[in-house]
Amino acid sequence: MRALLPEEGRGLFNDIVSGRVLGAGRHIRMIGDMMRSIAGLRIPAHEKLERCLRLGEFFKETRGKSSYAIVTAVNLMTAGFAEADGEADVDRLIEERVLAYFENSERDTLEIVRRFRNLVENQGLKKLMVFDYSSTVEKCVVGLHLPVEVYVPESRLIDGGRPFVRPFVEAGHKVHFIADAAMLTVLKKIDAVFIGAETFYPD
């Protein structure tokens, strides 16, 4: 799959599959950027669409198994690709589909951040715990107008806690980076726990 990408897309691909970059939201943006890099290749239009579809299927079957947000995003970004006319302006189609997804996603994220801020501030929540890296959870906590105390378990399996620390400190919050095994020792003092939605499964 990596070989189907231009050079600028291969680094993004590697960052996802190696786990160097975490967060479904970030991975979705990187997948969109890879599709846009395919649009810039000097290859037949139908092959560009085919590569984008194959790339999307790859990530749906791999990263999408742990985060359905990936599956939904890829489906939205590639909508209409399979039926596209060979004479269509494929570069423009790819660009428009990817950008439309991110415009809608940005609007939705801003609304989530606003509602999160209302919840935390209206309920007077002062001590939070965040678990398992999520770029959306990061944006929510960074977007709070008032400083809070945040406990961040290390999420050792994928080092999923560490990426939270710097943004929270820079936003003015008091941060405790703790071992996973210490979670139960602090839960009694926590007002609320927030995790990325992909941590939950219907079953």
Question: Across the structure, where does each feature detected by a protein language model lie?
Answer:
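A short, well-structured juxtamembrane/interface segment
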Residues: 104-124
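Long amphipathic alpha-helical segments
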Residues: 1-97
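Histidine-anchored nucleotide/phosphate-binding helix
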Residues: 134-146
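Nucleotide donor/acceptor-binding cores
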Residues: 125-126, 148
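Conserved phosphate- and dinucleotide-binding cores of soluble alpha/beta proteins
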Residues: 147, 153-203
